[in-house]
């Protein structure tokens, strides 16, 4: 049985779109401070600080327990509801950040929201970041986090695998690695704006430039070079959009 794919779409009213324009401009100005055209050490540090600022714009929800621990040498954290729910399901959350930024502090906002929305325990982890640790370091770390859940007694079908942006890419690549190894896949995928194509061949960079303040061609080029310089961006471990063998449901929940 293949994992369930959940697609969430929300149409905005004209009033919401009108309000969104100044917000998008503000976000673009903030993000530009952390979206280097080249990946020097100074610019990379600036990008990571910017990512932390963006993550802290929304404080974690109350009613949560947050437990940090070491997972096979990397930092990880459980986010749980204070009120027990008794479920044996868990969410493995892969954070975004272009594979070059993001940490447990950044992850905490979305992991809290996922725990609150589902009632499930959420495991987040700090995978190694590029360019210090390029591909496949993040994939190896995601596999370690998956194996940790298996050792804790969770079944593959009990796991919801979630990821946003580069974390969505990582979630899909993890599924592909599990499938290739003949292992069971997670029961559900939750992908939020997943980065599925590193070839930069789509038209959305120009067609949606005014409403996407974050993902400029300069930013994408910088982070993909940091993560996988010299590699074939069409490969399945970099561009999951190329998958032909990882079959997802034909009737996903919307």
Question: Which ranges hold each PLM region?
Answer:
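Alpha/beta-hydrolase superfamily serine-hydrolase fold, recognizing
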Residues: 34, 65-246
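Internal hydrophobic scaffold segments of catalytic domains
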Residues: 7-8, 194, 252-253
């Amino acid at each position: 049985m293949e994992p369930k794919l959940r697609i969430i779409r929300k149409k905005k009213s004209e009033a919401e779109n009108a309000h969104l324009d100044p917000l998008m401009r503000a976000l673009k100005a903030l993000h530009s401070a952390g979206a280097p055209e080249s990946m020097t050490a100074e610019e990379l540090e600036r990008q990571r600080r910017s990512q932390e600022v963006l993550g802290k714009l929304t404080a974690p929800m109350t009613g949560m327990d947050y437990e940090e621990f070491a997972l096979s040498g990397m930092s990880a954290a459980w986010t749980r509801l204070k009120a027990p729910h008794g479920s044996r399901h868990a969410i493995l959350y892969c954070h975004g950040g272009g594979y070059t930024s993001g940490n447990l502090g950044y992850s905490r906002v979305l992991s809290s929201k996922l725990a609150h929305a589902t009632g499930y325990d959420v495991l987040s982890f700090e995978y190694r970041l590029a360019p210090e640790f390029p591909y496949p370091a993040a994939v190896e770390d995601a596999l370690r986090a998956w194996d940790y859940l298996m050792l804790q007694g969770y079944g593959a079908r009990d796991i919801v695998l979630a990821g946003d942006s580069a974390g969505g890419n990582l979630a899909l690549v993890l599924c592909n690695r599990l499938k290739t190894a003949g292992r069971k896949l997670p029961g559900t995928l939750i992908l939020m704006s997943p980065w599925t194509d590193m070839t930069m061949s789509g038209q959305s960079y120009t067609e949606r430039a005014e409403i996407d303040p974050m993902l400029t061609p300069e930013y994408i080029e910088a982070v993909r070079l940091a993560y996988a310089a010299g590699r074939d961006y069409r490969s399945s471990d970099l561009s999951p959009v190329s998958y032909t063998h990882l079959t997802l449901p034909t009737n996903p929940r919307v």
